[in-house]
Amino acid sequence: MSIQFNQVSYIYQQGTPYEFEAIKNVSLTLEQGKYYAIIGQTGSGKSTLIQHLNALLKPTTGSVNINGLEVTNKTKDKHLRHIRKEVGIVFQFPESQLFEDSVEKEIEFGPKNFNMNLKNVKDKAFQLLLELGFSRNVMSSSPFQMSGGQMRKIAIVSILAMDPQVIILDEPTAGLDPNSKHQVMSLIKKIQIEENKTIILVSHDMDDVARYSDEVVVMNKGTIVEKSNPRNLFNQKTQLLKWHIELPKVVKLQKDIEKKYNMLFPKLAMNEEEFVKLYKEWHHEE
């Protein structure tokens, strides 16, 4: 399913002395099956933008077309049930939203609200949990006896198991150890590729943005200032400084080596594996 923003603006507390325009005249198309990253400083409008993707927020002006349904400030909630099933959001620190006394009950909660087949959902959740390193008795375990990182994984799986077409992740790996972070991000990329899902990642981690995303949307002061593939984006050092966006570590390393040896690699590496290959090829030529 595709999602299209048409000149969308959103104002918090409109008509009061505290009104604030969080996003301004945003037009954006998100295509089925792609992995998008949305980046920008805190306060740039990222969270407001993603809450329009399944109509948790409705535009103050403009419209959002979600799989053919035109959402405006006049759209009634009763028309949005299907959209909210097909567009799943994992909010920042989702573990704070857990409340059931077993993983199984936690997994069942969302699907019950949408009258989904619980066996299918639980089977899918169980396989995902095994891929994330849980033991086979995980479904009967209490989330509240687990570490913060394990609770985060449970919360993420509870959304993935409902099989939404669009998966939105707001800082999903914040606070996770490196191994857990790799497990989660690799699983999400696998789901995108194998199941043709649309992934929308909000992140301050430029290493993840470079490694996993197909396209990057840059927000600044409530507007979209750039939409590009990560390789092109991270070549724009001057603009990135202006937007207060860090380079990925591997890009910094490559730039340092190019400067030190007064040379240029044929392309910008987006992950460590790419860089090692480029470096070996260059070193062999030398």
Swiss-Prot record:
Q: One GO CC annotation, please?
A: ATP-binding cassette (ABC) transporter complex
Membrane topology listed for this record? Peripheral membrane protein
Entry keyword annotation includes ATP-binding: yes
Does the record bear Nucleotide-binding in its keywords?
Answer: yes
Q: Which residue range or ranges hold the ABC transporter domain?
A: 3-246
Record: residues binding ATP: 40-47
Q: Which compartment or compartments is the protein found in? A: Cell membrane
Mind telling me which InterPro entries this protein's record contains?
A: AAA+_ATPase (IPR003593), ABC_transporter-like_ATP-bd (IPR003439), ABC_transporter-like_CS (IPR017871), ABC_transpr_CbiO/EcfA_su (IPR015856), ECF_ABC_transporter_ATP-bd (IPR050095), EcfA2 (IPR030946), P-loop_NTPase (IPR027417)
The enzyme's first-digit EC class, named in words, is translocase
What EC number(s) does the entry state? 7.-.-.-
Q: Which UniProt keywords apply?
A: ATP-binding, Cell membrane, Membrane, Nucleotide-binding, Translocase, Transport
Single GO molecular function:
ATP binding
Kindly state the subunit structure of this protein: Forms a stable energy-coupling factor (ECF) transporter complex composed of 2 membrane-embedded substrate-binding proteins (S component), 2 ATP-binding proteins (A component) and 2 transmembrane proteins (T component).
* Cited PANTHER family: ENERGY-COUPLING FACTOR TRANSPORTER ATP-BINDING PROTEIN ECFA2 (PTHR43553:SF27), HEAVY METAL TRANSPORTER (PTHR43553)
Per the record, the similarity remark reads:
Belongs to the ABC transporter superfamily. Energy-coupling factor EcfA family.
The function of this protein is: ATP-binding (A) component of a common energy-coupling factor (ECF) ABC-transporter complex. Unlike classic ABC transporters this ECF transporter provides the energy necessary to transport a number of different substrates.
Annotated protein name in UniProt: Energy-coupling factor transporter ATP-binding protein EcfA2
Q: Which organism is it from?
A: Staphylococcus epidermidis (strain ATCC 35984 / DSM 28319 / BCRC 17069 / CCUG 31568 / BM 3577 / RP62A)
Please state the gene responsible for encoding this protein: ecfA2
